[in-house]
Amino acid sequence: MWWSVLAVSVGAVIGANLRWGLGLWLNASYHAVPWGTLVANLSGGWLIGVLMAFFSQSSVLSPEWRLFAVTGLCGALTTFSTFSLEMFAALQEGKWGMALVGILAHVVGSILMTALGFLTFSLVRG
């Protein structure tokens, strides 16, 4: 049990810091669009696809590795709450078009990136 808690916690620390770093880097560069959140969600969607494809094909690693990578790292890297806040702010500012594009980019993009992650794994694996 404690190894599971540790695995999730360490993964979450890494994922949250990656998300924070992406926000600092990309949101500061492009003020009009919160690119850091989008990149975090899309890359996290791709990564979780690769990881789930890997873990479904492999029993070499202990379950704690899946908890670390999927629940901890990907769970903290992707961020529905920040996405929701940014889209709500766009709506409050009357930026309906930006909000709609943002919602579609995050939701549809994340699903497509997850599928791409599974495809990437199958292509690499052969």
Swiss-Prot record:
GO terms for molecular function: fluoride channel activity; metal ion binding. Keywords: Cell inner membrane, Cell membrane, Ion channel, Ion transport, Membrane, Metal-binding, Sodium, Transmembrane, Transmembrane helix, Transport. It is found in: Cell inner membrane. It catalyses: fluoride(in) = fluoride(out). GO terms for biological process: cellular detoxification of fluoride. Disulfide bonds: none annotated. Na(+) is not transported, but it plays an essential structural role and its presence is essential for fluoride channel function. The chain crosses the membrane at residues 5-25, 35-55, 68-88, 99-119. Its main location: membrane. NCBIfam families: crcB, PRK14196.1. Belongs to the fluoride channel Fluc/FEX (TC 1.A.43) family. This is Fluoride-specific ion channel FluC. The lineage of its organism: Bacteria, Pseudomonadati, Pseudomonadota, Gammaproteobacteria, Pseudomonadales. The gene is fluC.
